[in-house]
């Protein structure tokens, strides 16, 4: 294989928009030329042939622009039309041209000279943090409160002793928390990482235009918050290394205290890392630790006050599924509070995407099979480094989204009408149990709790949750799609029974173009044959390659063992967010058609657009714990409506002729459709209803499904993408038919996971990857949100029992039927 196509020691022209060199290079390769490929059957080609540009004029999208609706001023800030054309740079490709020196010695010492010339010094970083935090008013109040609890009725002398005792405890906590950045250690680590990264990565690509935006943001003298996705332990070092190489101040990195281990913790502290508890409520009695919360809040405020940069992983932990997890916005709330108190004028938010051909951990099969997570230790880190040095992990693509003003975002949200979003229970129960009286609620559910909550606190919580969703959605849009993601996805959901190498290369090429057409970037370049072989090299443990003497071709088959399928699914999930909305429409289309069936209208191939959008929106709610599906400033109904419009544009759905629509009289179920769902679920606005010149029956239109082979294959592919998720949810619904309750939640998760694994081992499951532990946890969380389970707290363990609504067996059966209506097996 031609390594030059992938190592990218210099800028690869295939990354540059409208590159004539790129066009010529592609024309030389007959199998890559669009004109020749157009006559061959592939999974997506016909679905997008109407609107696809030719390969020669295809532009790489510039990803990561901020939300124009919520931050219109930031949209034009730090960005100019020349930014996207700046191209990519391989960060770990360093030679004498990157230094001020030339000659033989400069070539031999280029790494040392490059590191020495980086701008990093002590004055860049925070000083006197511990004392400033201890003397802050909030921490002083917390110390006095905790001391009062320790000595409620003591004398003044005893009270003074209690205060001193609490102060010592606070100082000890801060010693573990506060980082003491060492410029010398940053330089040394930069040199070591440059050597290490060159040994086990082929390249680390960044977009030079994105770095220009970050540099422009640093010149505002405002604190920056970097919020990247979390894929691997290497993430902690990767961002600091990239910023260091471009003379940008290293951020203070929030890290879980599971990494607070001897020697390694000292290194992390010297590089700007600070350790925080994974759970803030770690007092023996499970109460809020007032002192720790005050110290953490004071520490963040002090860093921001001194205009330091922060790096926070909103997901809280590495993604074990390959998908971006839901946000945990604890530290983000501290940042918002700091700005709300006018301590600093503004904060700039920078979401980030990180994509790997192969993560250094390789996979998370142990945890996905239900094995307990191993605690990190110095020995495990040493073994990991040794293992890394013996392998190659391919390419890395890091993206920095456009910085946006947190102050502007908060002000724009305050000007929007505040309305509480629908809970999953409010959104889905009317569809699952249509005969249930509206407004019915169980005793002991969250209804009474919500009513008693302070409205201001609830509004603040929603504001922070929406901000976190905004950031994660932008970060996911910024994540490049790697070659391993596409190959794993094709093998699992297009060619699960195996495929010839030549056909796999064709489908890879077309799927790559589909990714670009949806405004997602790629983390690779080169001709498709080389890139596919590159991906197969990293997925080798999960696939079987055989040589067929008949056609003299290699045949690629995904392995059927559970660990192999889990690993392929991990990498395949890297491309799921590209097609998630289209997959939701495809599954909803199946559900609507199946429901109408033989007893429906005269033309069962016609689908009500209104009905399809409602069904898709309810599926969005059902899958909302699988990650951020849309921006919070958009409703599910808006994006479902837009996606249906794209299906019409693709030609997959065809608007029926007026004569065909007039022949159809809506059935009773269709007439009552809106009555089964809460009023806010309409994707049309009140203004549209008032201004429309047409009746309700004329605003809805009917759609026909294209019967072409290519379109049907595309729909099937999309339905398979959600197959593992829906099979896991439906299997969980089957499992609760015999729920004995009450039961501790960890025990229930373990039993449900064992049930799913057993289904897979007995080959009952259609998708073996439906048995991953992540899907088990997400299914149970969704059932809690819907109101299937009531959650009880005993000491520090959560317990589960069926709610009053789902105690009747018939209602659990309706839940199962609702999920099964969406499942395509």
UniProtKB/Swiss-Prot annotation:
<dbReference type="GO" id="GO:0006650">
    <property type="term" value="P:glycerophospholipid metabolic process"/>
</dbReference>
<protein>
    <recommendedName>
        <fullName>Glycerol-3-phosphate acyltransferase 1, mitochondrial</fullName>
        <ecNumber>2.3.1.15</ecNumber>
    </recommendedName>
</protein>
<dbReference type="InterPro" id="IPR002123">
    <property type="entry name" value="Plipid/glycerol_acylTrfase"/>
</dbReference>
<dbReference type="GO" id="GO:0019432">
    <property type="term" value="P:triglyceride biosynthetic process"/>
</dbReference>
<feature type="topological domain" description="Cytoplasmic">
    <location>
        <begin position="119"/>
        <end position="825"/>
    </location>
</feature>
<feature type="binding site">
    <location>
        <position position="279"/>
    </location>
    <ligand>
        <name>CoA</name>
    </ligand>
</feature>
<feature type="region of interest" description="Important for mitochondrial localization">
    <location>
        <begin position="80"/>
        <end position="120"/>
    </location>
</feature>
<keyword id="KW-0496">Mitochondrion</keyword>
<comment type="function">
    <text>Mitochondrial membrane protein that catalyzes the essential first step of biosynthesis of glycerolipids such as triglycerides, phosphatidic acids and lysophosphatidic acids. Esterifies acyl-group from acyl-coenzyme A (acyl-CoA) to the sn-1 position of glycerol-3-phosphate, to produce lysophosphatidic acid. Has a narrow hydrophobic binding cleft that selects for a linear acyl chain. Catalytic activity is higher for substrates with a 16-carbon acyl chain.</text>
</comment>
<dbReference type="GO" id="GO:0016024">
    <property type="term" value="P:CDP-diacylglycerol biosynthetic process"/>
</dbReference>
<keyword id="KW-0594">Phospholipid biosynthesis</keyword>
<keyword id="KW-0007">Acetylation</keyword>
<dbReference type="InterPro" id="IPR022284">
    <property type="entry name" value="GPAT/DHAPAT"/>
</dbReference>
<dbReference type="GO" id="GO:0005741">
    <property type="term" value="C:mitochondrial outer membrane"/>
</dbReference>
<feature type="binding site">
    <location>
        <position position="328"/>
    </location>
    <ligand>
        <name>CoA</name>
    </ligand>
</feature>
<dbReference type="GO" id="GO:0005739">
    <property type="term" value="C:mitochondrion"/>
</dbReference>
<feature type="region of interest" description="Disordered">
    <location>
        <begin position="435"/>
        <end position="455"/>
    </location>
</feature>
<dbReference type="GO" id="GO:0005886">
    <property type="term" value="C:plasma membrane"/>
</dbReference>
<feature type="modified residue" description="N6-acetyllysine">
    <location>
        <position position="777"/>
    </location>
</feature>
<feature type="modified residue" description="N6-acetyllysine">
    <location>
        <position position="781"/>
    </location>
</feature>
<dbReference type="InterPro" id="IPR041728">
    <property type="entry name" value="GPAT/DHAPAT_LPLAT"/>
</dbReference>
<feature type="short sequence motif" description="HXXXXD motif">
    <location>
        <begin position="230"/>
        <end position="235"/>
    </location>
</feature>
<feature type="intramembrane region">
    <location>
        <begin position="88"/>
        <end position="118"/>
    </location>
</feature>
<keyword id="KW-1000">Mitochondrion outer membrane</keyword>
<keyword id="KW-0012">Acyltransferase</keyword>
<dbReference type="GO" id="GO:0006655">
    <property type="term" value="P:phosphatidylglycerol biosynthetic process"/>
</dbReference>
<keyword id="KW-0444">Lipid biosynthesis</keyword>
<dbReference type="GO" id="GO:0006651">
    <property type="term" value="P:diacylglycerol biosynthetic process"/>
</dbReference>
<feature type="binding site">
    <location>
        <position position="293"/>
    </location>
    <ligand>
        <name>CoA</name>
    </ligand>
</feature>
<feature type="binding site">
    <location>
        <position position="278"/>
    </location>
    <ligand>
        <name>CoA</name>
    </ligand>
</feature>
<keyword id="KW-0808">Transferase</keyword>
<feature type="binding site">
    <location>
        <position position="461"/>
    </location>
    <ligand>
        <name>CoA</name>
    </ligand>
</feature>
<feature type="modified residue" description="Phosphoserine">
    <location>
        <position position="380"/>
    </location>
</feature>
<comment type="similarity">
    <text>Belongs to the GPAT/DAPAT family.</text>
</comment>
<dbReference type="Pfam" id="PF01553">
    <property type="entry name" value="Acyltransferase"/>
</dbReference>
<dbReference type="InterPro" id="IPR045520">
    <property type="entry name" value="GPAT/DHAPAT_C"/>
</dbReference>
<feature type="topological domain" description="Cytoplasmic">
    <location>
        <begin position="1"/>
        <end position="87"/>
    </location>
</feature>
<feature type="modified residue" description="Phosphoserine">
    <location>
        <position position="692"/>
    </location>
</feature>
<dbReference type="GO" id="GO:0004366">
    <property type="term" value="F:glycerol-3-phosphate O-acyltransferase activity"/>
</dbReference>
<feature type="binding site">
    <location>
        <position position="288"/>
    </location>
    <ligand>
        <name>CoA</name>
    </ligand>
</feature>
<dbReference type="InterPro" id="IPR028354">
    <property type="entry name" value="GPAT_PlsB"/>
</dbReference>
<keyword id="KW-0443">Lipid metabolism</keyword>
């Amino acid at each position: 294989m031609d390594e030059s196509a992938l190592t990218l020691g210099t800028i690869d022209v295939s990354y540059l928009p409208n590159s004539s060199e790129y066009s010529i290079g592609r024309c030389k390769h007959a199998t890559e030329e669009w004109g020749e490929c157009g006559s061959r059957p592939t999974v997506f080609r016909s679905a997008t042939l109407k609107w696809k540009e030719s390969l020669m004029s295809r532009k790489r999208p510039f990803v990561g622009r901020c939300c124009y609706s919520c931050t219109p001023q930031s949209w034009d800030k730090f960005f100019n039309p020349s930014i996207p054309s700046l191209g990519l740079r391989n960060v770990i490709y360093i030679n004498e041209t990157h230094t001020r020196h030339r000659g033989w010695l400069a070539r031999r010492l280029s790494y040392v000279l490059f590191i020495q010339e980086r701008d990093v010094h002590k004055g860049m970083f925070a000083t006197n943090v511990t004392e400033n935090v201890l003397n802050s008013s909030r921490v002083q109040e917390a110390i006095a409160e905790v001391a009062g609890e320790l000595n409620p009725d003591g004398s003044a002398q005893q009270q003074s002793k209690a205060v001193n005792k609490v102060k010592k405890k606070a100082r000890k906590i801060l010693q573990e928390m506060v980082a003491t950045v060492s410029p010398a250690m940053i330089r040394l680590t930069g040199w070591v990482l440059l050597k290490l990264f060159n040994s086990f990565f082929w390249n680390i690509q960044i977009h030079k235009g994105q770095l220009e935006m970050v540099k422009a943001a640093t010149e505002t003298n405002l604190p920056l918050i970097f919020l990247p996705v979390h894929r691997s332990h290497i993430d902690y070092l990767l961002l600091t290394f990239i910023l260091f190489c471009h003379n940008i101040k290293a951020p203070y990195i929030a890290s879980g205290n599971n990494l607070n281990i001897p020697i390694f913790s000292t290194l992390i502290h010297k590089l700007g890392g600070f350790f925080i508890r994974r759970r803030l409520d770690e007092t023996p009695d499970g109460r809020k630790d007032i002192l720790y919360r005050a110290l953490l809040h004071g520490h963040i405020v002090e860093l921001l006050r001194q205009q330091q940069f922060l790096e926070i992983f909103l997901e809280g932990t590495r993604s074990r599924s390959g998908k971006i997890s839901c946000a945990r916005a604890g530290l983000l709330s501290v940042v918002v509070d700091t700005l709300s108190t006018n301590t600093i004028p503004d904060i700039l938010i920078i979401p980030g995407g990180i994509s790997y051909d192969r993560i250094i951990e390789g996979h998370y099969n142990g945890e996905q099979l239900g094995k307990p997570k191993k605690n990190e230790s110095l020995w495990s880190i040493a073994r990991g480094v040794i293992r890394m040095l013996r392998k190659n992990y391919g390419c890395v693509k890091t993206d920095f989204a456009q910085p946006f003003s947190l102050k502007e975002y908060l002000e724009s949200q305050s000007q929007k009408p505040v309305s509480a979003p629908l809970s999953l229970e409010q959104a889905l129960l009317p569809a699952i149990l249509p005969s249930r009286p509206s407004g019915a609620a169980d005793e002991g559910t969250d209804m009474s709790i919500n009513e008693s909550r302070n409205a201001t606190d609830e509004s603040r919580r929603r504001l922070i949750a929406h901000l976190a969703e905004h950031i994660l959605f932008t970060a996911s849009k910024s994540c490049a799609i790697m070659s391993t993601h596409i190959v794993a996805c094709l093998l699992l959901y297009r060619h699960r029974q195996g495929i010839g190498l030549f056909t796999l290369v064709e489908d890879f090429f077309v799927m790559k173009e589909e990714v670009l057409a949806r405004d997602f970037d790629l983390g690779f370049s080169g001709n498709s044959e080389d890139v596919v072989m590159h991906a197969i090299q990293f997925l080798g443990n999960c696939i079987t390659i055989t040589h067929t003497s008949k056609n003299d071709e290699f045949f690629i088959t995904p392995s059927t063992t559970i660990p192999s399928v889990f690993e392929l699914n991990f990498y395949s999930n890297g491309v799921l967010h590209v097609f998630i909305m289209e997959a939701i429409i495809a599954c909803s289309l199946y559900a609507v058609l199946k429901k109408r069936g033989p007893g429906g209208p005269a033309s069962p191939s016609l689908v009500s657009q209104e009905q399809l959008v409602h069904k898709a929106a309810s599926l969005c709610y059902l899958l909302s714990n699988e990650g951020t599906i849309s921006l919070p400033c958009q409703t599910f109904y808006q994006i479902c409506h837009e996606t249906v419009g794209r299906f019409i544009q693709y030609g997959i759905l065809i608007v029926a002729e007026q004569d065909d629509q007039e022949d159809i009289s809506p059935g009773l179920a269709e007439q009552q459709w809106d009555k089964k769902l809460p009023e806010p679920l309409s994707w049309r606005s009140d203004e549209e209803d008032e201004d429309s010149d047409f009746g309700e029956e004329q605003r809805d239109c009917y759609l026909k499904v294209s019967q072409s082979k290519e379109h049907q294959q595309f729909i099937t592919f999309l339905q398979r993408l959600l197959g593992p998720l829906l099979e896991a949810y439906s299997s969980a619904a089957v499992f609760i038919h015999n729920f004995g309750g009450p039961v501790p939640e960890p025990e229930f998760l373990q039993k449900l996971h064992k049930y799913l694994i057993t289904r897979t081992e007995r080959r009952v499951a259609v998708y073996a990857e439906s048995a991953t532990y992540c899907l088990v946890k997400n299914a149970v969380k969704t059932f809690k949100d819907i109101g299937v389970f009531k959650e009880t707290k005993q000491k520090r363990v959560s317990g589960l029992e069926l709610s009053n609504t789902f105690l009747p067996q018939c209602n659990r059966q309706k839940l199962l039927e609702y999920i099964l209506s969406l499942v395509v097996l």
